[in-house]
Each structure stands twice: as C-alpha cells, then as structure tokens.
Amino acid sequence: MAHFNQNFINSIKQDLPSHLCMEDFISYSSKPLRPSIRVNTLKISSKNFIKLMTPKGWHFDPIPWCENGYWIKLDQEVQLGNTIEHLQGLFYIQEASSMLPPTALLSVEQHDAQQYVLDMASAPGSKTTQIAALMGNKGLLVANEYSASRVKVLHANIARMGVANCALTHFDARVFGEYMFEIFDSVLLDAPCSGEGTIRKDPDALKNWDNNDVKGIVDTQKALIDSAFQSLKAGGELVYSTCALSRQENQNVCDYLKQRYPDAVEFINLSSLFPGADKSCTEEGFLHVWPQIYDSEGFFVAKIKKVSSIERVLPEPKKQKNFPFEKASAKKIAEIVEYLKTSFGIVLPSENGIYVRDAEVWLFPEDFHKLIGKMRFQRIGMKLADVLKKGFKVKHEAVLALTSPNTIELTDDEAQVFLMGRDITLSEKVKPQGETIVSYAGVSLGVVKHLGNKLKNNLPRDLVKDKIARYEQS
C-alpha cells in the first residue's frame, strides 16, 4: 500500500489539472504497475519477438507511444531478468512511461540519421539503449553518468543490448555546456528529481516528502537544463523529462530556460506525438502524465528547439591531451577485417573507426574522431579483439553487437547450459572448427571453442548465471 505524505497531498492538489480528481490519483498510485518491456530492434524485430515468445505464454498489449514497447502478461510466473531472451539482449524491462522521452527526442524521420546525440543522465541505460535503437546504431551517442557505481551497470546494459555507437562519460553533467558547446543535434536530459511519479513502483517514495528538499533539486535541474541547452547546436532539439509530478520541477524549470534565452527557446507541442497524447498535454505543449491517464507511472516530458545560437559565456577549455588510442594502421585494419570475416563471417559496418590501444583493437563510432580532445571518455565504442602473438581473439561484446551468418544454433536447453558457463557436449563427434559463435533464436549468444566432441564455453565469468528461468511445459 502506498504511503502518502500529507504535505505532498496538500502541495500536489494545486498542480493537479481541473479535469482530473485526487481520488483517482490516489487510487491509481496505489495499484501495482503493469509489467512492460521494450523489444530491442538492434537484434530482433517486434514481429519476430512476439512470434518467439507467444508459444511461451506471453501476451502483448502495445504501448501507444513506443512502436516496440508492450505491456505484457505471462501464463506462468517467470523471473524476466533471468530468461535467455533477456540475457542475450532481445528485450529491456522498462516502465512504459520512461519510453516517452526517447520517442519525443527522435521522430521516425530521424531514425538512422548520422547525428550527434547526448544522454546526460544515462544509467541504468533503458533510455540510452532505446535511443541507440532509434538511431539504428548509427551516428554518435554520448551517454553520461555521474555516479561511478552506476557507470558499470550502464556499460553492462549497453553491451548486452548490442549498442555499438556509444561513448561513455562520467561527469557532473553541468560541464557539458562548457566542454561540448553547441555540438549536439539532440540532447536528452532525464533530470534527477524527487521521484513523485514512481510511487507505484516504490510505495515509500513519498513517505518523507519535503518541499524544502524539492527546492534544492530544482536548483540542480535548472543548472542541468542550462548546460544541456548550451551543448545543443542551433536548430537542435532538447527533451527535458522527470518522473516528478509538481510544476516546480517541470513547467517552471522549462520556463526558467525560456526566460534565460528568450530569443533562442521554442517549446514544441507534443499533443500529436502519439494517439491520445492530447489527454496529458499542457497549454505549453508539454506532456504531464498523471498515473490515472494511461495507467502508468507519473512522468513529464518537454521538447525544446534551439532556434538560434547563443553567446558562449565561458572560454573554450584547453584540449585534453594523452588520448590513449591511435588510429590503426592499414595493415592492422586489413588483418582484423580478414580475421572477423574468415573466422565468423562478420563484416564490419565501417573500417574508419578502428583504433588500437596496446594489444587491443577497438571499433569507435565513425564520427567520434571530431570529439577527441574535448573531454575524457570512460569507454568508446566496443572492443573488437585482443591481439595475440599469432592472430586475434574476438571479444564477447563485439559478438553481441555484430551480426554473424555463421553460427551454431542452440536449443533452449543448450542455451541455458551455455549461459550457466558450462560446456556443451555434442551428440556426435565431428571435425573441430575452432572459435565459433553460438546463437539462440538466430541471435548471437557468445563464443565457444569447437573441439569436435564438445563446445568449450568462453562466456566471460562475470556474465555466468547460477540459474536460468525456465518455462514449464503445458
């Protein structure tokens, strides 16, 4: 049962639109959320995913604002995070409302465009991986996370979902306006907030709500939206979102930006973003999603266009030195391209982004070179392979992100054995094939060494699971 702080109730009454009632808000906020997932179209189409999961007792109800998002019901209770399909990155467990900001950020017309996109507060990665899918793994996506512990989680999800066009940073996002002034075509600021809209997931979210705490959060939000706007190119678009419900964390923060840059800020009306969007649309054109409108978490989404350039206040910082990578030589590029093609049938999307560091070969997003020296990056693109005395050894994250036509397809039971870190015994002995990719549902799971009578497991130890969720046979 949700716990409502009376101070919060008194405050939120003032912000609740006149056509909505407090009783419905409390009623819906006390209900559990409908489980929802987003299909990862970097690996599988929604059509094929539904075809794969329907025989396993999944039922799908489309989420109107995300073309690959679904509310789901299962015939039997299964731990979704431990299913084969989740572990191999076919879907992301994501609350329906949180799929709104990326949808608002990148319209269908912008899908696959070669552009620079910034996600200022990325972890754990639901919106980042959704943006990457909307970009079709093209262009450059900079994903920033301030919390050191959450950067690791962010990278794990990016790797699992097969994201290849991403560069990770670890900064207080207030620095982007200074270090990346007018660089990005699109910016998402899913701002830290009081989390009022998450009460359906966390019944204690409002137990200790205090308006004095909110005032401090608002100051941070204003500084962040200012930084986001400075990092945006003229003509670029910014989406500001929170899972808060009050005007002071939402409309007022957007109004602050408009007052600060009156000639450069234009609010974009989102009333036609999806069928029914008008039900949550404010007079400014923002989406203020209350739990009772779509039976979801509470959320706020605003889209802002930068109609003209602004004056740079701080001088351009000095160029960062000691970039630890160097462009691969033509010889090294030819060798790694040949290795991947001959061994696995993998054809790289581009050879322009191949860099080396010590005995490592990396594939950077093709347009990343323009950002070298602007700031320090935690991780760029993906590691393709380690250089051995003779040849290379492919990395797991590369196998997950790059399509291979030459795989050994595993059964349900074999895929579970593989994800638990065990070797797979073959029914009959054949000629050893060496390094080979194994797949499930036509999507890569990882690398094995084919020894003729068994497949030796090469799954990274930190990805090995003690238990894989199983569906009981009906």
UniProtKB/Swiss-Prot annotation:
The EC number(s) this enzyme carries: 2.1.1.178
Entries under PROSITE patterns matching the protein: SAM_MT_RSMB_NOP (PS51686)
Localization per record: Cytoplasm
One annotated GO molecular function: rRNA (cytosine-C5-)-methyltransferase activity
InterPro entries (UniProt xref): Methyltr_RsmF_N, MeTrfase_RsmB-F_NOP2_cat, MeTrfase_RsmB-F_NOP2_dom, Nol1_Nop2_Fmu_2, Nop2p, RCMT, rRNA_ssu_MeTfrase_F, SAM-dependent_MTases_sf
Catalytic machinery residues: C243
Catalysis performed (reactions): cytidine(1407) in 16S rRNA + S-adenosyl-L-methionine = 5-methylcytidine(1407) in 16S rRNA + S-adenosyl-L-homocysteine + H(+)
Any one annotated GO CC term: cytoplasm
Keyword list, A-Z: Cytoplasm, Methyltransferase, RNA-binding, rRNA processing, S-adenosyl-L-methionine, Transferase
Domain of life: Bacteria
Protein residues bound to S-adenosyl-L-methionine: A121, S122, A123, P124, G125, S126, K127, E145, D172, D190
Keyword Manganese: no
Enzyme superclass (EC): transferase
CDD domains: AdoMet_MTases
Similarity comment: Belongs to the class I-like SAM-binding methyltransferase superfamily. RsmB/NOP family.
Function: Specifically methylates the cytosine at position 1407 (m5C1407) of 16S rRNA.
Annotated NCBIfam families: nop2p, PRK11933.1
Protein name as it appears in the record: Ribosomal RNA small subunit methyltransferase F
